[in-house]
């Protein structure tokens, strides 16, 4: 596959630290669907280049959703593969535990092709028709407080898939509620970004976006014992989540619980900024803690604000997630008549 690099787009200073991008040091593009709305953070500039047709795909870093969230807000496809499948050499780390090199594309097929290039492997998406697929919708955290646009698009998508013969179960997946407690001190991102940036931050803090610097500094208070406790807690958490996921071909969730919010109210309001930032990361970041894989694809109706559907699974379930995503994309494109009710 011949690849041409056409340029670099604006991105957040340090990967996923803001899921909502606003930087005084650079111009900020709005969402392509709504110029006054945020384009998201990190790989938001790359998402805009793909959405406008300036590039076929955009490469980026997904540490807590920085590929999937911009894709969702721009009506694109973002695939976060299992971390170990793509090399991380040569890039500045945010979190060596969570960072994943991956990409934004316009279709699931393109995501499959580009993943093959990045991972130097031949993906084998499991080709299975909707009828017979066993899918699950986690009820803990993932569907809380959805805005009207996201709720409408998500429920319609589930109805379309059921009409196509997919079995969709609601499951609790209760361990999702524990993540905020596990990461109360800042988690892997704070500890590992502080480790890498501390000398530079102490010497050249003026070069950092103030909101980014604030989040990196959370790692300053974490001890070695805190970090080791987090490593063990994560391993235990992963085992419990995987046990509840067993038996399903993939899980389904909204990628982001809201459509692109307006940018203006966030520029000078730190409290509002961090509240929206946390909300936008909420559904995507658990996949990174799981060491899992996930693909966001558009599921909104034509003419509506973009909404992303996240198809996700455990580590090394990449081909299954890609295969299910291909089927869902085709079903939505075909406009299968939705079933009545959920």
Segments and roles (model prediction):
Residues 167-185, 216-217:
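Short connector loops at secondary-structure junctions
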Residues 183, 228-229, 260-281:
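Short, surface-exposed loop/helix-turn segments at secondary-structure junctions
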């Amino acid at each position: 596959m011949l690849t041409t690099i056409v340029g670099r787009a604006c991105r957040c200073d340090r990967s996923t630290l803001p899921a909502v991008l606003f930087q005084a040091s650079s111009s900020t593009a709005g969402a392509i669907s709504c110029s006054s709305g945020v384009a998201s953070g990190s790989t938001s500039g790359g998402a805009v280049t793909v959405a406008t047709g300036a590039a076929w795909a955009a490469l980026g870093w997904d540490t807590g959703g920085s590929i999937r969230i911009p894709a969702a807000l721009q009506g694109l496809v973002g695939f976060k593969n299992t971390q170990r499948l793509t090399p991380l050499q040569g890039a500045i780390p945010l979190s060596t535990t969570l960072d994943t090199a991956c990409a934004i594309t316009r279709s699931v097929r393109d995501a499959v092709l580009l993943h093959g290039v990045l991972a130097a492997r031949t993906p084998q998406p499991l080709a299975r028709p909707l009828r017979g697929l066993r899918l699950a919708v986690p009820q803990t955290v993932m569907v809380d407080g959805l805005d009207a646009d996201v709720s409408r698009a998500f429920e319609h998508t589930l109805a379309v898939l059921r009409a196509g013969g997919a079995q969709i179960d609601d499951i609790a997946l209760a361990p999702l509620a524990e993540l905020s407690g596990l990461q109360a001190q800042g988690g892997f991102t704070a500890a590992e970004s502080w480790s890498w940036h501390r000398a530079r931050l102490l010497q050249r803090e003026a070069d950092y976006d103030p909101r980014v610097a604030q989040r990196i500094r959370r790692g300053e208070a974490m001890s070695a014992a805190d970090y080791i406790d987090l490593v063990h807690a994560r391993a235990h958490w992963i085992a419990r989540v995987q046990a509840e996921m067993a038996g399903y071909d993939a899980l389904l969730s909204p990628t982001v619980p809201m459509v692109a919010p307006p940018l203006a109210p966030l520029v000078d309001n730190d409290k509002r900024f961090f509240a929206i930032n946390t909300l936008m990361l909420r559904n995507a970041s658990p996949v990174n803690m799981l060491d899992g894989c996930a693909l966001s694809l558009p599921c909104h109706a034509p003419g509506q604000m973009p909404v992303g559907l996240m198809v996700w699974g455990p580590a090394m379930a990449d081909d299954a997630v890609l295969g299910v995503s291909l089927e869902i994309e085709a079903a939505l494109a075909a406009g299968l008549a939705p079933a009545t009710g959920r």
